[in-house]
């Protein structure tokens, strides 16, 4: 998460340096306005992944989480690629079990619906 933020902050994309500076400033302002520590943002990310994983199988490769500021509002943007939607019965079972959101952040749901570490 922090590496994504730093990558966006210092990326070397082609384009106008004025626009790049503007985008960097927006990212910094978003983090300042949200007043979230990196640890709090990471905990929130893990909890969101845990809840969403109860209902759908996620593709951990394309996941993105970041803060964005626009018009005085700060938003948490989450891009979660979905591999498949779980059957309703499986989703209900996972919801009742109350998965632990403090799992591996790149974890993908296993057959039982619990998060497990991705295979190498």
From Swiss-Prot:
Superkingdom assignment: Bacteria
UniProt record, GO biological process: cell division; regulation of division septum assembly
Region (Disordered): 93-120
Swiss-Prot/TrEMBL keywords: Cell cycle, Cell division
Annotated Pfam families: MinE
SUPFAM superfamilies membership: Cell division protein MinE topological specificity domain
Function, as annotated: Prevents the cell division inhibition by proteins MinC and MinD at internal division sites while permitting inhibition at polar sites. This ensures cell division at the proper site by restricting the formation of a division septum at the midpoint of the long axis of the cell.
Family the entry assigns: Belongs to the MinE family.
Protein name, per record: Cell division topological specificity factor
Annotated source species: Synechococcus sp. (strain JA-3-3Ab)
């Amino acid at each position: 998460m922090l590496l994504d933020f730093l990558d966006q902050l210092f990326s070397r994309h082609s384009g106008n340096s004025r626009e790049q500076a503007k985008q960097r400033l927006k990212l910094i302002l978003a983090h300042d306005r949200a007043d979230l520590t990196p640890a709090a943002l990471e905990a929130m990310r893990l909890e969101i992944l845990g809840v969403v994983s109860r209902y759908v199988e996620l593709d951990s490769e394309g996941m993105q989480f970041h803060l964005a500021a626009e018009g005085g509002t700060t938003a948490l943007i989450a891009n979660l690629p979905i591999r498949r939607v779980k059957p309703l019965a499986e989703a209900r079972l996972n919801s009742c079990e109350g998965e632990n959101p403090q799992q591996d952040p790149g974890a993908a749901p296993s057959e039982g619906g619990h998060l497990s570490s991705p295979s190498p």
